Amino acid sequence: RATPVDVSALYILLDKMHRETVMSVAPINPEKLIGAINTAIHRGVVLLAEVKNKIVGSIGGLASSEWWSDQMHLSDMWFYVLPDSRNSSAAIKLVKSFIKIGNEANMKIKLGHVYSGDFERKDKFFGRLGLVKAGSLYTEVN
């Protein structure tokens, strides 16, 4: 699990994720991103994949509920693995660990992928882990 010591490295990782988007997205507000990372570390779940003491991937999220229910679920804020580590087991280990933490807390998992492209491959990846696709997201593009 990530600790406050990891905030700077996570910022750099998530900035790389942001730069890989296939659609136009809003620019990063550094203070807001640092605040979100800290919130996830202190009140949620932030897991790291490391190779030789270097972070190569992360998944982070919070417990929340749907607007119509009190039932809690564990939802990701981000899930990203560096391109050079995508053929490793980093992604599957991160997601399986995230699911396990949610299950141990009696929460269902909600994961998404938006803006990053390669949608079919990612849908299949999540499907192999027992997750079911639940819709789509539509947005205006500038």
Regions found by a protein language model. Give the residues of each.
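A short beta-loop-alpha structural element at the N-terminal edge
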Residues: 1-12
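Conserved GNAT-fold acetyl-CoA-binding loop/helix
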Residues: 15-36
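A short helix-loop-beta-strand connector motif used in the catalytic cores of GNAT acetyltransferases and
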Residues: 36-48
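A conserved beta-turn-beta hairpin within the catalytic core of GNAT-like acetyltransferases
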Residues: 65-76, 134
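A short, internal acetyl-CoA/4′-phosphopantetheine-binding micro-motif in the GNAT/acyltransferase core
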Residues: 77-88
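Conserved acetyl-CoA-binding loop-helix of GNAT-fold acetyltransferases
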Residues: 87-100
